Swiss-Prot record:
Name of the protein: Heptaprenylglyceryl phosphate synthase
Matches recorded under Pfam families: PcrB
InterPro entries: GGGP/HepGP_synthase_I, GGGP/HepGP_synthase_sf, GGGP_HepGP_synthase
Role this protein plays: Prenyltransferase that catalyzes in vivo the transfer of the heptaprenyl moiety of heptaprenyl pyrophosphate (HepPP; 35 carbon atoms) to the C3 hydroxyl of sn-glycerol-1-phosphate (G1P), producing heptaprenylglyceryl phosphate (HepGP). This reaction is an ether-bond-formation step in the biosynthesis of archaea-type G1P-based membrane lipids found in Bacillales.
Required co-factors: Mg(2+)
Binding-site positions, sn-glycerol 1-phosphate: 6, 153-158, 183, 203-204
Amino acid sequence: MKHLFKLDPAKNLPRNSVTKLIHSGTDGFIIGGTDNLEIEAVENLYELLAETDLPIFLEVSDESMILPEAEHFLIPVVLNTENSKWTHGLHKELIKELGDFIPWKRITSEGYVILNKDAKVAQLTEAKTDLTDEDIIAYARLAENIFRLPIFYVEYSGMYGDPEAVRKVSEVLSDTEFWYGGGIRSKEQAAEMAKYADTIIVGNIIYEDLEKALETATIFRKKTV
């Protein structure tokens, strides 16, 4: 997967917009958000995407993001926080409650490093965002070599990140997939981050300028003579 759209169930998205996203050339979708999450909204958004054969990932930040019919679940582990609630606390409580029913083969964990101090997710998780490139690289190595996480996700959450930092991270990961998300608002920015990240995630621009969002997926289309 090279490109994913991230959709927030707390935000309104017309059916025709969803159809355009499905046929844009993207490789799939993440459904996830930070606040005002309700199970009905998650179900409605999942149903809107039902016409696609593309993978749909539910990013589980609380119980409202759990749909039994979903095929793919992402479990975020926030690495740059000292609040254990977001590294393993909530995870343990959900496992304690639902452990006998969890479809483990449909679950993928992702090591998050959140880098925009003004983002809701940074404030919620108490993320330490004032990091050097060396700090970020250390977290990448921690994710791959200590925790053996399949995904390392650098999240600037609404703010376009530093391509040089992203490049440096890409050079130290070999087995763990490198995902980048944050502030991609043009196909040029998408192409820049795609040079380094295995997968780019495009989110906010969907709700600001749908056509520009669609353009970010076109850079991966194979050219025909």
